Swiss-Prot record:
The keyword Cytoplasm applies. One of its GO terms (molecular function) is RNA binding. Keywords: Cytoplasm, mRNA processing, mRNA splicing, Nucleus, Repeat, Stress response, Transcription, Transcription regulation. It comes from Caenorhabditis elegans. Interacts with chromobox protein homolog hpl-2; interaction may maintain localization of hpl-2 to gene bodies. Residues 173-259, 262-341 form the RRM domain. The keyword Zinc does not apply. One of its GO terms (cellular component) is cytoplasm. Residues 1-58, 132-167, 343-414 are annotated as: Disordered. It is found in: Nucleus; Cytoplasm. RNA-binding protein which regulates transcription, splicing and RNA-editing. Limits the accumulation of double-stranded RNA by maintaining the abundance of the mature RNA transcripts that are formed from double-stranded precursor RNAs. Stress response protein that acts downstream of daf-16 in the insulin/IGF pathway to regulate longevity and the cellular stress response to osmotic, oxidative, proteotoxic and endoplasmic reticulum stress. Involved in the regulation of physiological processes including aging, fertility, growth and locomotion. This is Tar DNA-binding protein homolog 1.
Length: 414
């Protein structure tokens, strides 16, 4: 009988992992975990339904990490300050909580699902007040910070200034009528201009006793009719020649406070240039800048002195023409400049240092621009003390000898 020994099953020895293998397994598990989180991140975000306050179709807004960004809400609904929804238990509107920073809308306790949200917008009066305060602050900042570069910047102030100038030139103004006969009545004065167009306002200025002052004002119904009046070189009203002009531009001032002048000095002229040529050249040039601008007056001094003055109805057109520097009239290049008004303070001929009394009045009287006064008496010659000779002079007359010192025969001064 054979010796039977029990067979013992031998299990294979456990595999011993090296440290390198353990590191590889840890990295593999980390990669799997990262892949799962990436898959969660790439899933579509949750959307909430927001009703447009204007009654349009609702809009779905995305959420980021369970919150709605205020920038997303305001980009979709300008002026929005928050969200609200209807509480089914109480029937009242419940506002969505805003975080302290004011940048996020926190989800309700039961989440964003199954709810329709409505936009909360500030009242219009508060928005207007906020916008006006912001505009006032920015305007104050511009006023403080832009004093130096306001002339060089062609910003909003420059555009508004040009807009006001265009609006002023596009509306009829009160035209001044000079040289009106003192016997002309208001009816005759108005009838003359009604033959040209529709008169809105017409008046002859009178004194307190009712007598005419010799001038008046008229306003036409449109700029076109006003230009018709200004285009007539001579107006004969009640048998008398009258001048019709736009009121003096010195009453209008630019933003620096300087007067706006519409009178142009034209130099380098020859006697071959006449008034008609100046009117045509400057009228066409003015209309190229301001459509309603016309030449209101041309003055050529007599006797001819080589220059003239051209007055336009628009100061802006005059400035633009002068900025060119020169124009060609009858084949001749003429010089241009703004005709500055003569200041009253600069009419004296100069200081009167060291002059005797009475010479100042004499110089004022002899000024070429001074009007003579009728029956004016001539000024008396001032008393001027004759020059004194302080050198020794022999005095031999008996009258002078009495002033000598007693006993001195050589005369005074010895």
């Amino acid at each position: 009988m054979a010796d039977e020994t029990p067979k013992v099953k031998t299990e294979p020895a456990a595999e011993v992992k090296s440290p390198l293998d353990e590191v590889k397994e840890i990295r593999k598990e980390a990669e799997l975990t990262q892949t799962g989180s990436d898959e969660k991140k790439t899933t579509d975000p949750e959307f909430i339904t927001v009703q447009d306050p204007n009654g349009d179709e609702p809009i779905e807004l995305p959420t980021v990490d369970g919150v709605v960004l205020m920038t997303t809400l305001q980009a979709s609904f300008p002026g929005a300050t928050g969200l609200k929804y209807k509480n089914p238990k109480t029937g009242a509107n419940r506002a969505v909580q805003v975080d302290p920073s004011g940048l996020k809308l926190i989800a309700p306790a039961d989440g964003w699902e199954n709810k329709t949200f409505f936009v909360i917008v500030a009242p219009q009066s508060e928005r207007v007040r906020a916008l006006s305060s912001a505009d006032a602050t920015s305007a104050k900042r511009r006023k403080v910070g832009s004093s130096d570069d306001s002339d060089s910047d062609d910003g909003r102030d420059g555009r508004s200034g040009r807009k006001r100038a265009v609006e002023r030139d596009s509306q009829p103004v009160d035209l001044i009528v000079l040289g009106v006969d003192f016997k002309t009545t208001d009816e005759c004065f108005q009838k003359y201009f009604e033959d040209i167009g529709t008169v809105v306002f017409c008046e002859i200025k009178r004194k307190s006793d009712g007598n005419s002052k010799g001038f008046g004002f008229v306003r036409m119904s449109s700029v076109g009719e006003q230009n018709k009046v200004l285009a007539i070189p001579q107006h004969m009203i009640d048998g008398r020649r009258c001048d019709v002009k736009v009121p003096d531009g010195r009453s209008l001032q630019d933003k620096q406070g300087r007067p706006s002048i519409s009178r142009i000095f034209v130099g380098r002229l020859t006697d071959k240039v006449d008034e008609h040529q100046l009117r045509k050249v400057f009228g066409d040039e003015a209309k190229s800048y301001i459509e309603t601008a016309v030449v209101t007056d041309v003055f050529i001094p007599k006797p001819f002195r080589g220059f003239a003055f051209v007055t336009l109805s628009s100061a802006e057109a005059a400035e633009r023409i002068v900025s060119k520097g020169s124009l060609t009239v009858n084949g001749l290049s003429v010089g241009l400049s703004i005709a500055q008004p003569r200041e009253e303070n600069n009419q004296s001929v100069g200081p009167d240092y060291g002059l005797p009394a009475g010479y100042r009045n004499r110089r004022e009287r002899d000024r070429p621009d001074r009007r003579p006064i009728q029956n004016e008496a001539p000024l008396p010659m001032p008393f001027v003390r004759p020059p004194q000779d302080y050198s020794y002079r022999q005095q031999n007359s008996p009258l002078e000898r009495r002033y000598w010192a007693p006993g001195d025969s050589r005369g005074p001064g010895w």
